[in-house]
Amino acid sequence: MLEELNKKYDRLQLKYGSKELDSIYNGGCTESPDICFVFMNPTGRNIASLKTWKGRKSPWIGTKNIWTLFYNIGLLDEEIFNQIKSKKAIDWTYEFADEVYECVSKHKYFITNLGKCTQVDARPLKDEVYLEYLKLLYKEFEIINPKVIVLFGNQVSSIVLGNKISVSECRRKLFSKKIKGKEYKFYSVYYPVGNGSFNAPKAIEDLKYIIEEVRG
């Protein structure tokens, strides 16, 4: 079960994350989703990382940019998206966070980060830190059994695939990797938010292509 991994993530949060923030886990469709999206590492902009937050500890709660991306590629209902646009972070309730992730599940995708050690800001993490999370991420893949996995950015792609990856050189290229005897399919995509936001149009193009490939 995914929940059984959370205690391990909490221990790694104490080791590598901000002490005043909680680890952020994952969320979405957990039974053979069409796509598993793997981001880098959570920040304190996610209000679910606050210790006072007693709801789900899933990625991107209280933020806007990534939900705009999902809306633009057809993976978020307009009604939910309009509510997200109208809300400040503090306006998100536990119930609304659940509503958003019910919509994610309905659209058959799963959201996670390679790293789960929440930082106060979007500081870069060394490969060594991400490598401590790699086997746990592989375990997530094993549990949810996604059709395709999308890796955002060069660093995440390189660590998960075990090869030096430059997204600009492998756009729309299908990678295959065997993990515990099972073959998984991967695409490497530009990181679409934060420092990578200038690449968002290219990310959207490639994600639409991937969705079409997966769903036909």
Language-model features, listed with the residues they occupy:
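A polyanion-binding, active-site-adjacent surface
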Residues: M1-V148, N154-S168, K185-F186, Y190-S197, ...
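Catalytic phosphate/metal-binding cores of nucleic-acid and nucleotide-processing enzymes, i.e., regions
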Residues: C170-R172
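Ligand-binding pocket scaffold of soluble enzyme catalytic domains
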Residues: G196-K208
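Charged phosphate-binding loop/patch that engages nucleotide di/tri-phosphates or the phosphate backbone
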Residues: Y209-G216
